[in-house]
C-alpha cells in the first residue's frame, strides 16, 4: 500500500517583512491562501521565528486543515549534538524531547521538526543517532532534513562520492529521504534541462527502496541566482518538474519557494511575493498540485512494476539506481512504442488491469510537439490528463497522443 502523497514547500509565511511584524489579519489571509494553493505541509519561514509565532502558525495551520513543521533552534541544537553528550542517556533524551515538545503537541497540526538542510556527510552520524532517539520520543512526527543533489561540490558534501553521501543518511530512522535537484536552467539565453536529473532520482529511489523509505523531491517554483535556475513562471515548467518526479516514484513533492525569501534580490517569482501577494508561480503550482492529487487518487491501488524513459529515441529502463538498456518485460499489454521527443514513463498493474503513466521530458519551453505512440491491444483507450478522463479510438491497438508542455497522461485499455 502506497503512503499518502505529500505536497509541501520551502520558505514559509514569515513573522516579519522588512523588519515590520506581520499582523494577525495578514497572517489569517496568508494561511488561507497557502491552503488554497494545494500545499498541505506548511513550511517554516526562512528567518528565525519567535516561539509565539511558531505557536500561532500551528493554530493557523489547524484552522486551514494543514500540517505545520516547526523549526526550533533549541531542539535543533540539542538533537544535532546529542551523540556528543554521553552524559545524556537515551532514556533521559527521550524524556527531554517529549517534555520540551509538549507545547507543540497540543496542536494536532504539529507535523514535527525541521532539523537541517543540505548537511554534509560529516553530520550524518549525529543525525542518524538523534533520529533513532527522536523516533522513540515522538513516533509519527517528522525528523525532517533535506539532502544535497549530486551536482553539489565535494567541498559541500565533504566526500567525493555522492553514493556514499546518500548511503550515510539512509541509515536515519525516518520514513523518507528528501533531496533537491533543480533541473531547469538558463545560460546565455538558452533554456535546458540540467544533466543528471534522471540519474539522481534513480539513485535516491534505489536507496529508498532498499531501506523501505519514501522518496521526497523538490521542484523549483522560485527562479534564483538571478534567473540561472528557472522556476515555475509557466505551467509547463511547473508540470515538467512535478510530474517527472512523480512518475519516477516521488511520494513527496516540495516547492522551492512558497514565500519569496527575504534574503537577497536573486529570488524571483515565488508563489507569493515578499509583500504577501500571489506571484506568477502561484496559479501554475496550484493547478499542478490539483492535477497531482487527482492522478494519485486515480491510480489508487495500482502498483508500479516498471519505470523507464525514451531518450533521443532510445528506450531506457530505470533499474539498479540508473538508466539501463535492459529490455522491458514481454508480458506488458500496455507499452510505449515511440516518442517524438524525450519522455519518462511508469507501468502500473492492479490485478489484471494495466496502464502506463507517460510524462513529457522535453524542455518545457521548447515549443516542440511530442506525439507518443502507445500499444494498448484494445479498440479504445482511456486517457487521464489534467485531472480529466477521455476515451480515444485506437487504430490497430495503438494510440497516438500529443503531449503538451510538461504534460502527463495515464493510458489504460478499454473496449477489448
Regions found by a protein language model. Give the residues of each.
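Glycan-processing catalytic domains of CAZymes
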Residues: 1-378, 385-416
Amino acid at each position: 500500500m502506497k503512503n499518502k502523497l505529500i505536497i509541501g514547500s520551502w520558505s514559509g509565511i514569515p513573522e516579519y517583512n522588512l523588519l515590520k511584524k506581520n499582523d494577525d489579519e495578514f497572517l489569517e489571509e496568508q494561511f488561507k491562501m497557502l491552503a488554497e494553493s494545494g500545499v498541505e505541509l506548511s513550511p517554516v519561514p526562512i528567518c528565525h521565528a519567535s516561539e509565539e509565532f511558531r505557536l500561532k502558525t500551528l493554530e493557523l495551520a489547524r484552522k486551514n486543515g494543514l500540517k505545520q513543521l516547526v523549526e526550533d533552534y533549541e531542539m535543533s541544537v540539542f538533537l544535532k549534538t546529542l551523540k556528543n553528550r554521553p552524559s545524556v542517556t537515551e532514556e533521559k533524551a527521550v524524556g527531554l524531547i517529549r517534555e520540551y515538545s509538549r507545547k507543540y503537541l497540543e496542536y494536532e497540526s504539529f507535523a514535527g521538526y525541521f532539523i537541517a538542510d543540505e548537511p554534509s556527510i560529516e553530520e550524518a552520524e549525529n543525525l542518524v543517532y538523534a533520529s533513532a532517539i527522536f523516533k522513540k520520543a515522538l513516533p509519527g512526527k517528522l525528523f525532517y532534513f533535506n539532502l544535497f543533489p549530486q551536482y553539489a561540490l565535494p567541498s559541500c558534501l565533504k566526500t567525493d562520492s555522492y553514493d556514499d553521501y546518500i548511503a550515510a543518511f539512509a541509515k536515519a530512522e525516518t520514513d523518507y529521504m528528501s533531496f533537491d535537484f533543480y533541473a531547469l536552467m538558463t545560460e546565455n539565453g538558452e533554456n535546458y534541462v540540467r544533466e543528471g536529473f534522471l540519474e539522481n532520482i534513480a539513485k535516491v529511489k534505489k536507496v529508498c527502496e532498499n531501506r523501505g523509505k519514501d522518496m521526497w523531491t523538490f521542484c523549483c517554483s522560485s527562479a534564483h541566482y538571478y534567473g540561472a535556475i528557472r522556476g515555475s513562471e509557466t505551467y509547463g515548467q511547473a508540470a515538467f518538474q512535478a510530474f517527472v518526479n512523480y512518475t519516477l516514484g516521488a511520494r513527496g513533492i516540495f516547492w522551492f519557494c512558497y514565500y519569496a525569501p527575504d534574503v537577497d534580490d536573486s529570488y524571483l517569482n515565488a508563489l507569493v511575493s515578499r509583500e504577501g501577494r500571489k506571484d506568477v508561480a502561484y496559479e501554475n503550482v496550484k493547478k499542478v498540485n490539483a492535477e497531482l492529487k487527482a492522478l494519485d487518487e486515480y491510480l489508487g491501488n495500482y502498483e508500479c512494476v516498471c519505470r523507464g524513459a525514451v531518450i533521443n529515441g532510445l528506450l531506457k529502463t530505470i533499474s539498479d539506481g540508473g538508466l539501463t538498456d535492459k529490455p522491458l518485460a514481454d508480458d506488458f499489454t500496455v507499452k510505449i512504442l515511440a516518442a517524438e521527443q524525450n519522455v519518462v514513463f511508469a507501468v502500473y498493474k492492479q490485478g489484471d488491469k494495466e496502464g502506463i503513466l507517460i510524462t513529457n521530458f522535453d524542455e518545457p519551453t521548447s515549443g516542440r510537439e511530442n506525439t507518443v505512440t502507445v500499444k494498448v491491444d484494445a479498440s479504445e483507450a482511456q486517457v487521464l490528463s489534467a485531472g480529466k478522463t477521455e476515451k480515444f479510438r485506437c487504430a490497430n491497438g495503438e494510440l497516438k497522443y500529443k503531449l503538451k508542455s510538461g504534460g502527463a497522461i495515464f493510458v489504460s485499455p478499454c473496449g477489448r
